[in-house]
Amino acid sequence: VSSGAWLSSLAQKSRLAVVCEPGRPNGAFVRSRKGRAVWEVVFRGVAAHAGNNPQDGRSAILAAARFTLEVNQLQDYSGKGTSVNVGVIHGGTVCNTVPDLCKLTIDRRCCRDEDGQAIDDAIEALALRSCGNGIHVEAKRLSLSSAMPYSEKNRPLIELVNEAARLEGFEAQWADAG
């Protein structure tokens, strides 16, 4: 169950809206949120017995490990605020078999949608480059949500919240969410 489509339809009819995203430990309200994409990348190799004929195998896990090291280089957290995290890896069945399957799940976050698109393009290019020599790769973006940056367009709403907070006797604090 998702409220995304419903909220999107309401947004088309609204001038302003307050999103009640859970606050931060210091009680700050969230004024901006990074965009996010979730990727699944599936590596298929060739199974072989690790003792009798390992040379006939093509390790999906080894290909996924190389890909993971490369995709990790796409992040620029301290500069553009982008992060790329290979957070889930599933592969292999038993330790005496060259694994023919490995699946990765990637979380990508960006402050600007254009930076996110550049990283998504790079993930696809790295997946394509990982193919060959008995390894097949399929990269699929499972979900995408746009960044919600702080801007002059949402400043009036933030000022309304600031004023409401002052009327209640406190100063609103603001944070940017990842």
Pin down the residues of each PLM region.
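Acidic/histidine-rich catalytic neighborhood of metal-dependent amide-processing enzymes
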Residues: 1-34
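Metal-dependent amide/peptide-bond hydrolase catalytic core
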Residues: 22-27, 31, 37-42, 46-178
